[in-house]
């Protein structure tokens, strides 16, 4: 199976740019209902992600009392590389291992351009549909995911 099967293309993904203001980022996050959003640079390269907590800490650290105060600062100030992308040719078991720890996995092409995301929800939905029920057994997952899960339970 190819990871493109799970890909949500960039034009269907809510994302921010490094030059978006904190206010724009907060509004986009509120309107989308997401708790974390990918960020790209002006050339379309994946720059990282921002989470709700990143906004909160920046607001608290700067003492903002009005959202309009966040209009002069950009997402660049809070973007993080905690969520690392996978290349388009990444093996499915590596994708599944990454999806264990993050809500979505950013996907980049050979030029490091952001091409979309794969959500943990879509992966789980696929396995539920494939299995015909909501009971998912370890046999449905590659061995590397099973060993990653086992190490988390220690």
Question: Where in this protein do the model-derived segments appear?
Answer:
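Short glycine/threonine-rich beta-strand-turn micro-motifs
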Residues: 46, 113-114
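Acidic (E/D-rich), amphipathic helical modules within compact regulatory domains
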Residues: 23-66
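Tandem CBS (Bateman) regulatory domains
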Residues: 1-12, 51-102, 119-154
